């Protein structure tokens, strides 16, 4: 007859095996949850809408007049086929051929970043063949957070730069990544905004302005797209490193991202000009399942680095004691 004492002795002698078995079981349960558990999980979380097709049933997938004017006016969903087609056909510029050398002002400077690349290499274990997005790519060389990754680690990605002169210089670099002369939308739909060209980096200052206001040469109207729309147009939902520098609008951009649809491992966010402040970014990213790795503070950068907390869904308590 099995006694409580014999059961206790069995547990003690086979503790390691039992812990391993329980751990594997829990991991499998988490990795392949039942449809009921998925349904219950969605019910317990506060529902956030991201302007996606699945949220607006009845909205036609195909429109008669698929133009950027239509997309802006109707605030098309981030994943609407019309919007993705516009980005793909009219805004995504192909990488320079691999046999065309880079055209750099300072070719001997391997890493022009202000420390962001060091964080990427450390946290991603010198990952090769990765994929990045750099918003605020400037001229593609000066203080670039991705040039080293492209040159030395065989990465590729998306370089987003709305400021006309900076983009013109970027296009001359022969980078081996896709480029867009656009801004990331501050809304969950495409918008056209006015852009201040007088500052070195440039920044969004408001809505689209009239031609008379453009004639002074200080402003430009720029088309913005949600980050998720750009990724879908490129056929990408996995990003190893996202560098976000949009002169104060970083938190607004982050809030447009449907985090349940994309997988972004590492993010560097400039926080210096964000009106809501550093801790607002940290708190928001924590809610999205990211860990604050640390800050980069130099005369040229004020970034906070986040890494996805891949252990968050695997945590559990194991208690082993005699009652």
Where do the language-model regions lie?
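Phosphate/nucleotide-binding beta-alpha loop and adjacent structural elements of enzyme active sites
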Residues: 2-323
């Amino acid at each position: 007859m099995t006694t409580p004492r014999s059961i206790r002795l069995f547990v003690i002698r086979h503790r390691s095996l039992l812990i391993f078995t329980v751990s594997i079981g829990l991991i499998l349960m988490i990795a392949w949850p039942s449809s009921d558990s998925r349904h219950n999980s969605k019910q317990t979380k506060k529902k956030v809408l991201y302007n996606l097709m699945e949220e607006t049933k009845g909205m036609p997938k195909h429109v008669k007049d698929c133009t950027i004017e239509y997309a802006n006016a109707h605030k098309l969903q981030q994943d609407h086929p019309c919007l993705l087609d516009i980005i793909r056909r009219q805004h995504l510029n192909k990488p320079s051929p691999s046999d065309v050398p880079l055209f750099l002002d300072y070719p001997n400077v391997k890493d022009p970043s202000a420390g962001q690349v060091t964080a990427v290499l450390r946290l991603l274990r010198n990952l090769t063949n990765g994929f990045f997005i750099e918003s605020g790519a400037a001229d593609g060389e000066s203080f670039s957070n991705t040039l080293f990754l492209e040159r030395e680690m065989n990465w590729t990605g998306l370089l987003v730069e709305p400021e006309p002169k900076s983009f013109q210089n970027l296009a001359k670099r022969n980078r081996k990544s896709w480029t867009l002369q656009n801004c990331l939308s501050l809304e969950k739909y495409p918008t056209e905004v006015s852009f201040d060209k007088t500052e070195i980096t440039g920044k969004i200052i408001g809505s689209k302005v009239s031609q008379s206001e453009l004639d002074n040469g200080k402003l430009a109207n720029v088309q913005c797209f949600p980050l998720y729309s750009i990724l879908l147009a490129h056929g990408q939902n996995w990003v190893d490193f996202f560098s976000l520098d949009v002169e104060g609008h970083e938190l607004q951009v982050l809030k447009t991202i449907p985090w349940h649809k994309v997988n972004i491992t590492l993010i560097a966010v400039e926080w210096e000009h964000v009106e809501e402040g550093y801790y607002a970014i940290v708190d928001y990213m924590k809610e999205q399942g990211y860990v604050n790795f640390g800050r980069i503070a130099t005369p040229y950068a004020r970034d906070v680095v986040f890494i996805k907390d891949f252990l968050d869904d695997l945590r559990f308590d194991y208690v082993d004691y005699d009652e």
